[in-house]
Amino acid sequence: MDGYYSLSPISVLHRIKDSFHFAVSALLANLFSALFTFFFALVGTLLGALTGALIGQETESGFIRGAAVGAISGAVFSIEVFESSLLLWQSDESGIGCLLYLIDVIASLLSGRLVRERIGPAMLSAVQSQMGAVESQFQDHTDIFDTAISKGLTGDSLNRIPKVRITDTSPEIVSCSVCLQDFQVGETVRSLPHCHHMFHLPCIDKWLRRHASCPLCRRHL
């Protein structure tokens, strides 16, 4: 039987067994990957929707829009984190580095920290878009009636609004509702009368030149 090679029944069975094991392993790997992706996306969506709704309720974006932006951003970010974990797992021969990273990511995800960090820029864009739309409508209204009367504050009125310097003894360190950035110790912010909502000077001054009201609660100044 020169030039002819025949496989024994045992060799054929071994090859079939190996192929079966490979197929099952690939199927299980894809199944676990899909389950983990779904888990990350679900947690990110829920936390994102909750965080976005809370931020939206405190800003002009609104509860519904905030929840929608938060849910989408949270889901996308969570999936990106999971995919990064897979790449790290493939690049790390021992897998220990990826395991530690994954544990930290899951803990941060469940606590909501990662999602909140991602929601901030997304909600900032939504708030700025909303404020831009309001300013555009106001400008269109002014053009239609051809009036030069501004509904915003004058420079003198704006300068009379009190400024507050953030210190270590401040009762509560909050964030600016326009840019969503936390106030830092030593910063000077503007505190609106009546409602006492505080904003960064560049953030609120631009708004007040157009509107004589608080952008958060709409209380007239």
Curated annotation (Swiss-Prot):
Coiled coil: none annotated. Induction: Up-regulated by chitin. GO terms for cellular component: membrane. Keywords: Membrane, Metal-binding, Plant defense, Transmembrane, Transmembrane helix, Zinc, Zinc-finger. GO terms for molecular function: zinc ion binding. It comes from the Eukaryota. This is NEP1-interacting protein-like 1. It comes from Arabidopsis thaliana (Mouse-ear cress).
